[in-house]
């Protein structure tokens, strides 16, 4: 039996936490709450705006870096991101390793008028309805965390609720699985969730193999405008940035710098 990876350990905790939440609020109750929520915003329209989009993340901690920032007011941070020009706000809701919560998602959804992404490790259909009930417009699905049949059903369920799935991959094989499942938005994570090692060339290897009608998002490794431009040159439509923003002294200005670079006439445009 192979030793457990970092991802395996995270998923074990997530399953336990989902079971605990479902014991308090049943699947039928969370489905009803999702159905009663305001309709989701148009994520695809936001991602297709001109230039390289910035998805700015509310992120307190990570397994690789530990504690990143004390975020006493996630709503205030999200508003700063929106004021800086972010197209989408990503909210970590995993509790054990990332110190996030559904309360953070609620606070951010109430604070901004742009789409919100729930970033978590989705392993149960319950979490999809939960995301919608708490106002998410977009939901992360990690290929490495799901068998193919589960990936297909999770993607279908996400879209059936009107949300957009961000399907995350780290290898060419995972990208192929994402495409076979019907992914319309694929995020290439430079970080291997099994080992936490970062491969900054990962996006440049995988993106050329993706069809032109698929939205391509570069995740991890964006430390500034130089990284954004490099990802743009490799075909990115958007970048997802967390650590670099929460550790900056001025998150609004940090987002604005990235947005300016991503919309500058000299910024490479994705081939379409």
Curated annotation (Swiss-Prot):
Its EC number is 4.1.1.48. The keyword Amino-acid biosynthesis applies. PANTHER family: INDOLE-3-GLYCEROL-PHOSPHATE SYNTHASE, TRYPTOPHAN BIOSYNTHESIS PROTEIN. It is an enzyme of class 4 (lyase). Pathway: Amino-acid biosynthesis; L-tryptophan biosynthesis; L-tryptophan from chorismate: step 4/5. It comes from the Bacteria. GO terms for biological process: L-tryptophan biosynthetic process. InterPro entries: Aldolase_TIM, Indole-3-glycerol_P_synth, Indole-3-glycerol_P_synth_dom, Indole-3-GlycerolPSynthase_CS, RibuloseP-bd_barrel. It catalyses: 1-(2-carboxyphenylamino)-1-deoxy-D-ribulose 5-phosphate + H(+) = (1S,2R)-1-C-(indol-3-yl)glycerol 3-phosphate + CO2 + H2O. Belongs to the TrpC family. This is Indole-3-glycerol phosphate synthase. GO terms for molecular function: indole-3-glycerol-phosphate synthase activity; phosphoribosylanthranilate isomerase activity. It comes from Mycolicibacterium paratuberculosis (strain ATCC BAA-968 / K-10) (Mycobacterium paratuberculosis).
């Amino acid at each position: 039996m192979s030793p457990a990876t970092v991802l395996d350990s995270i998923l074990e905790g997530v399953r336990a936490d989902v079971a605990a939440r479902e014991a308090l609020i049943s699947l039928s109750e969370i489905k009803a709450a999702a159905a009663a929520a305001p309709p989701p915003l148009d994520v695809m329209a936001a991602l297709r705006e001109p230039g390289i989009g910035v998805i700015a993340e509310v992120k307190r901690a990570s397994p690789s870096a530990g504690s990143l920032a004390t975020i006493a007011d996630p709503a205030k941070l999200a508003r700063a991101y929106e004021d800086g020009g972010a197209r989408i706000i990503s909210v970590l809701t995993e509790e054990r390793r990332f110190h996030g919560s559904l309360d953070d998602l609620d606070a951010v959804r109430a604070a901004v008028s742009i789409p919100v992404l729930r970033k978590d490790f989705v392993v149960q259909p319950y979490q999809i309805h939960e995301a919608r009930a708490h106002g998410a417009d977009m939901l992360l699905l990690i290929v490495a965390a799901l068998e193919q049949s589960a990936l297909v059903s999770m993607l279908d369920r996400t879209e059936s609720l009107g949300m957009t799935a961000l399907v995350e991959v780290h290898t060419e094989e995972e990208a192929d699985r994402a495409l076979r499942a019907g992914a319309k938005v694929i995020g290439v994570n430079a970080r291997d969730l099994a080992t936490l090692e970062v491969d900054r060339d990962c996006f440049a290897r995988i993106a050329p193999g993706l069809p032109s009608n698929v939205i391509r998002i570069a995740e991890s490794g964006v430390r500034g405008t130089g990284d954004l431009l490099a990802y743009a040159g490799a075909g990115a439509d958007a970048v997802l940035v967390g650590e670099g923003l929460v550790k900056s002294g001025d998150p609004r200005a940090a987002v604005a710098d990235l947005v300016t670079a991503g919309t500058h006439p000299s910024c490479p445009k994705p081939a379409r």
